Regions:
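C-terminal structural segments of small proteins and small subunits
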Residues: 66-98
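Amphipathic, hydrophobic secondary-structure cores in small proteins
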Residues: 26, 30-78
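Short, charged, intrinsically disordered terminal tails
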Residues: 2-9, 95-98
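Short amphipathic
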Residues: 9-20
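Intrinsic disorder
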Residues: 2-3, 17, 73-74
Length: 98
């Protein structure tokens, strides 16, 4: 795990690899959104140049992030560090699937 980096727009960013066997389908998307919604700041997820609201189940599913996909989580706000840490932990533990 590397430390999040700040981009020019003031967002903390962290690249993550999707590790679970099925990628981000409905259940992992719901878990991601439930976690993201605990934070007050803005959270986005980017894959292959497409950026979606990280608090949207449909948006996450539309990214079609399969196993091994690289996604970037962007967070901004007073709790951005904590948001990225918790979302990274969720992804790294394979959404509790495997």
């Amino acid at each position: 795990m590397s430390a999040p980096k700040a981009n020019d727009a003031g967002f903390l960013t962290q690249e993550l690899t999707i590790l679970n066997k099925s990628g981000i389908h409905a259940r992992p998307a719901a878990m991601f959104v439930k976690t993201a919604n605990r934070f007050t700041g803005d959270i986005f997820v980017e894959k292959d140049g497409e950026k979606i609201n990280g608090k949207s189940i449909m948006g996450l599913m539309m990214l079609a992030a399969g196993p091994g996909s690289k996604v970037t989580v962007l967070a901004k706000g007073s709790d951005a560090d904590a948001a990225i840490a918790e979302l990274e932990a969720l992804v790294n533990r394979k959404f509790d699937e495997d």
